[in-house]
């Protein structure tokens, strides 16, 4: 599944926990990343290709084998305290970040569903961990902050290899008074610009373009202060025009299929 034996799970590096990934594959080639699996079914209304319909993505569980290691990558015997410590780290209530040192720019979101202990009589062995991915994608994170006091523009590249529009999260800080009108427009795609106004001086709002929500740092709903024309990013380069006295932090997690 992953080539490197080192990884980060839920913000903690495997070295800190004294564990590593192992594989039992004897071949030179091993599986890498997540499998892509999408079902296609036949519409009963017809028999040619135009009558095939796409089902939802089939998200397959993955298995990772985790061994306890000492200095020099020497496998160690487990004890009950260590088992509890490691399983407590691996079992989470929600999907959490997984980053393999194969490529630290790729983030996966996984949730542990099963742990099986494979030990001999000396408790030497490994944990077989089954995890459910959030999706069939890895994600490339992007975050950049811009400050404008005059109309200006910037370029952002949607690096996803999916043919879908991406809707980012915008953190907007109003640097003017309540009369300041903030406009954000993607000139690369058709559609109206996103407009928000009536914010207090230095008020910060988070705009989730996918969920269609606008909240300030007091968790107050400010949806009524925008026109609900959410920013969308096309694949590849996008030129974004901005007007108003504003600080914008644009945050993306572009999905990629490997």
Where are these regions (language model features)?
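Mixed-charge, glycine-accented linear interaction segment located at domain edges/termini
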Residues: 9, 132-137, 147-148
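Polar/acidic, low-complexity leader/linker segments enriched in S/T/G and N/D
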Residues: 1-42
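Short, acidic/charged, Gly/Pro-enriched secondary-structure junctions
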Residues: 67-112
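Intrinsically disordered, low-complexity segments enriched in serine, threonine, and glycine
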Residues: 139-258
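Oligomerization/assembly interface segments of phage tail-like spikes and tubes
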Residues: 50-75, 123-137, 238
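Beta-strand elements of well-folded, non-transmembrane domains
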Residues: 68-72, 102, 114-116, 133-137, ...
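Short beta-strand and beta-hairpin "edge-sheet" elements
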Residues: 95-137
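Short, solvent-exposed beta-alpha or beta-beta edge segments that form flexible loop/patches at the rim
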Residues: 28-65
């Amino acid at each position: 599944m992953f080539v490197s034996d080192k990884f980060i799970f839920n913000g903690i590096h495997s070295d800190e926990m004294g564990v590593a990934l192992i594989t039992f594959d004897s071949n030179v080639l091993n599986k890498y990343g997540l499998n892509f699996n999408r079902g296609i079914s036949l519409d009963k209304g017809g028999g040619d290709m135009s009558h095939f319909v796409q089902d939802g993505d089939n998200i397959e569980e993955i298995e990772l084998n985790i061994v306890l290691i000492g200095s020099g990558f020497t496998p160690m015997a487990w004890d009950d305290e260590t088992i509890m410590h490691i399983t407590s780290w691996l079992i989470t209530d929600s999907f959490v970040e997984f980053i393999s040192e194969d490529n630290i720019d790729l983030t996966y979101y996984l949730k542990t569903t099963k742990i099986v202990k494979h030990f001999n009589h000396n408790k030497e062995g490994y944990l077989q961990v089954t995890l459910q991915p959030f999706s069939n994608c890895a994600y490339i994170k992007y975050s950049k902050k811009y400050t404008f006091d005059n109309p200006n523009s910037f370029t952002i590249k949607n690096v996803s290899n999916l043919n879908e529009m991406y809707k980012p999260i915008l953190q907007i800080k109003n640097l003017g008074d309540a009369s300041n009108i903030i406009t954000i427009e993607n000139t690369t795609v058709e559609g109206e610009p996103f407009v928000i106004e009536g914010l207090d001086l230095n008020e910060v709002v988070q705009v989730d373009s996918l969920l269609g929500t606008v909240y300030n740092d007091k968790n107050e709903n400010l949806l009524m202060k925008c026109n609900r024309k959410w920013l969308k990013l096309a694949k590849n380069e996008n030129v974004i025009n901005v007007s108003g006295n504003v600080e914008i932090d644009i945050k993306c997690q572009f999905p990629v299929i490997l």
